[in-house]
From Swiss-Prot:
Domain of life: Bacteria
Domain Ku: 16-202
One GO term of the biological process aspect: double-strand break repair via nonhomologous end joining
Designated gene of the protein: ku
Annotated organism of origin: Acidobacterium capsulatum (strain ATCC 51196 / DSM 11244 / BCRC 80197 / JCM 7670 / NBRC 15755 / NCIMB 13165 / 161)
Family matches, as InterPro entries: Ku70/Ku80_beta-barrel_dom, Prok_Ku, SPOC-like_C_dom_sf
Protein name per its UniProtKB record: Non-homologous end joining protein Ku
């Protein structure tokens, strides 16, 4: 049984005079099964960290700790949790979609975290469905602001890429001041001359390695390696050694590397194609055999009759 995640945020989605209730649920979760603690190397006991006053060294309980803003060196003003909760920020309860843009206009570097957007209850379903359909047909994303996790975020709300999914997607975005200038970092790259033959080979290599994107094909190999390490420790066996890739020979230049890469892809494609062809022939042969056997049985029945 799948345990449904609880809403992370609930409030109103507003477009001009249209307003209805929605809930946001995080679209991602951590699947890591390996969690490390800090332990003492000699005793193996877990190390605990205490929060202490710097002058007296006296430990402070969590219930006695509040946030503080340092307005001068070593001087703070306390800020209670209630003070933050009572901030008069409209986006804490309402996402007001201020403008709509084509989804492709949003720079992928702006995206932070995805959320599923659902109608808050059955009475909100009609308005939700109308807005969702309009976003899907126009290919637009609504841009607004939302207060989450102690700060305000830009948020883009759009229809999912799969039309069979009847919800909406929300993506928190970074503000302009959070983005580093790409021009500043790329300015030192010189526009080198591109060799037409090298470009042709690079295009061919990309084309041969192109396929439909399937996220399930990619696995977290680092997590797997950590699991092997932990299992080896538990069983008191030698630690698994990392396989070193065998050298493929010295690459003379870019042209040579491109040609060899395209050649390897050609060989791989032929190998896969041959295996698939043999599999199809084997399958057809088995089907013919079944037909022959089936026919033999019917002949026997006719003879016995």
């Amino acid at each position: 049984m799948v345990i449904m995640a609880r809403p992370y945020w609930s409030g109103q989605l507003r477009i001009s005079l249209v307003s209805f209730g929605i809930s946001l649920i995080p679209a991602t979760e951590s699947k890591s099964e390996i969690h490390f603690h800090e332990i003492d190397r000699e005793t193996g006991q877990r190390v605990r960290h205490q929060k202490v006053l710097p002058e007296s060294g006296e430990a402070v309980e969590n219930r006695e700790i509040v946030k503080g803003y340092e307005y001068s060196k070593g001087k703070y003003i306390p800020v209670e949790p209630e003070d933050i909760q009572n901030l008069r920020v409209a986006s804490s309860k309402t996402i007001d979609l201020e403008q709509f843009v084509t989804v492709d206009e949003i720079d992928p570097a702006c995206y932070e975290k995805p959320y599923f957007v659902l109608p808050e209850n059955a009475s909100q379903a009609e308005a939700f469905a109308v807005v969702r359909k309009a976003l899907e047909e126009t290919g637009k994303a609504g841009i607004g602001k939302i207060a989450l996790a102690g700060r305000e975020h830009l948020v883009a709300i759009c229809a999912p890429g799969n039309p069979r999914l009847l919800g909406l997607m929300a993506y928190t975005l970074r503000f302009a001041e959070e983005m580093r200038s790409a021009e500043q970092y790329f300015a030192g790259i010189e526009a080198g001359k591109v060799d037409p033959e090298q470009l042709s080979l690079a295009r061919e290599l990309i084309q041969r390695k192109s396929s439909s994107f399937d996220l399930k094909k990619f696995k977290d190999e680092y997590e797997t390696a950590l699991r092997e390490l932990v299992d080896a420790r538990l069983k008191h066996v030698a630690l698994p050694r990392q396989e070193v890739a065998t050298a493929r020979g010295k690459v003379i230049d870019l042209m040579d590397a491109l040609r060899r890469s395209v050649g390897e892809e050609n060989g791989r494609k032929k190998s896969v194609s041959g295996a698939q062809h043999r599999s199809r022939r084997k399958s057809k042969g088995e089907q013919k055999l079944k037909v022959v056997r089936s026919g033999s049985s019917s002949d026997k029945r006719r003879k016995s009759a």
